[in-house]
Each structure stands twice: as structure tokens, then as C-alpha cells.
Amino acid sequence: MLSFTAQLDRVQLDSTVRLPPFQTEADKQAMDARTREAIDVAYANVRSFHEAQKAPAKTTPSKHAAWAPGEDVMEVTTMPGVVCTRFPRAIESVGLYVPGGSAVLPSTSLMLGVPAQVAGCKTIVLATPPRSDGSIAPEVLYVADKIQATCIVCAGGAQAVGAMAYGTQSVPKVDKIVGPGNQYVTAAKMLVQNEVDALVSIDMPAGPSEVLVVADASAEPVFVASDLLSQAEHGPDSQVV
């Protein structure tokens, strides 16, 4: 990863892995209060939504040794002596790919990281490309601390996907990789999900962003522009109309 990061991102690093706590005092000072507050509000909103998804619609406190005491389990007796159950189990380890080539995306970090945190994933690996000076955006570091990420992989592209899929001496192997990226990231995700040696799943192959906004004279121009920019910032191949 070090050689690919130097070759492709033109950043020289001594290590590609950072461990918590991720924010230094300099990182904290680099974030203004309004940005911190906006991230806190977004975190609370995303968390409240995914917290509501945890429990099944109809639950019964578990009485079986296979589940934790008091765990909510949906149980249905289909016929005498036959009980079917449904109960949630978190994926053991997940890899979150957060793009960073064209924009700082703490929003992506939240959308990927909060569900993993709420679900109870034991290992959360966040991969994001470093900036030209080798640093990671303070906003992304702040989110990584909030979601209690296991580590940050300071690398992007196919090499980051490969590191999470197969594992390295410093990067934990994950069971599932989620998150958007460019065509190289998408191709890498599709390749590793079909690799027997990787034994990793992905969320989906994410294509280039595109959006069509239909607006009339009553539309608020600032809102329309914001909707367009939110997609256009994803990359040079994004299409906004």
C-alpha cells in the first residue's frame, strides 16, 4: 500500500494505518464550531434512524440458551413443536471506503459508520485516501472517533479495497466492504467479492453520480444548487442537470 500510495497519490507515508484516538489537538483546532455542530446533528439523526431498525416488529424476550438473556427474538410456532425464529446478528468486521479525492466527505463516513456502530460490529476499518501532505481531513477523523472505528487506513483506490479484503500485517481482514468510489474502487470491489481467497461481500457496485432536478419558478435557487453540487462533487464524471 505504501508503494501504491506513493505512485498513485504521490504521497510518501511511513505507515498507512492510524489507531484511535484519531484526532490530535491540531485536528480539533482545525475544525470550526459550526462544522462540529453540523456533524453532531447529522450523527444523531442517522443514529436515531438506524436504532429504530434494530428490533423486529414483534418480539419475545429470549428464553433459549442460544441467545443472550433478555435478547429480543421474533418467534413463530408454525406447527406444534416447531418454532421458527428471527434474531439480529451484526457482521463481525466491516470495511468502510470513504472517498476523498475531490471533496471531504464526513457525510459518507457517517452513513457507513453509524449503522456499523449501531449494529455492534466488533471491527470497523475506515479507509480513505490521504491529502497531499499525508494527513486525513479533520472532519473525517472526528467522525471516525464518534463511530469508534478500530483503525483508519490512510489509502484509497483498489489497494485499499484489496488490503481490507485480504488483510495485511497492519490492516484487519473484513467480512464486508461498503462505500462508494471511482471506477477503480468499484472494479476492485467486484473482483474481491468473487475471489474465493478473499471471502468478502460488498454492498453494491456504485456507478458515477447523476441527478436531474426538476424545478419551476417557485423553487428556491439555493436549494436547487445545493442538490446539484452534492452530486457534482463526487467526481469529474458526475452528471448533474
Model-found features: residue ranges?
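N-terminal Rossmann-like NAD(P)+-binding subdomain of aldehyde/semialdehyde dehydrogenases
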Residues: 1-89
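Flexible, active-site-adjacent loop/turn segments at secondary-structure boundaries
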Residues: 11, 17-20, 74, 82, ...
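A broadly conserved amphipathic alpha-helix scaffold signal in soluble, globular proteins
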Residues: 44-47, 51, 110, 114, ...
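Conserved NAD(P)+-binding/catalytic subdomain of aldehyde/semialdehyde dehydrogenases
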Residues: 146-240
